[in-house]
Amino acid sequence: LPIDLFHERLILNDFETIEDVEKFFSDHYSVLSNRYGVLLFLYSILFTKGYEKLLSEINDISEPLIHSNFGYGSQSLINLFLTGRAVAHVFDNDQDIGGMKLLGINRQSDIGFITLMEQLRYVQVGSFYKNPKYSIWVLASETHLTVLFSNEKSLVSPETAAEHARRIFNQYDTENTGN
């Protein structure tokens, strides 16, 4: 099926409950496992989020969600998949930098995210991503994403009082002085 014909045949379904969604995907699992399954999953997430809400979360609407030359998903797209928010940053909470509000990860994620870019000091991943609810992480390298997981439950834990205090302090310590 050519891609243009695929798009012509798309049908938008509305569901009232999560049970309806689960039943639909259970009954139509083969649709998601076919040639355009990932694209259908992407469309499902984007339509569920809604155009207006998506635009309100993306800092730079000129940045594409998918890189046109290489097909890489943007950080906003990765964050949308992992947290439900299409924010461009991986730090904890929102930050105000010189009057510009930068949206970050606003709560502990079910699935974590870590990146080689942090080791290179390009970004700082917050504790909400580093310490997810489940011991599953997406690891980003320069060219691809890898899913890591473990049955070892001790790798993740709820945020401690000290971690909570440090996170709150860091919200107000915008220059990272530590004082």
What do the predicted segments below correspond to?
Residues 1-172, 176-179:
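Cysteine-dependent deubiquitinase/ubiquitin-like isopeptidase catalytic cores across multiple families
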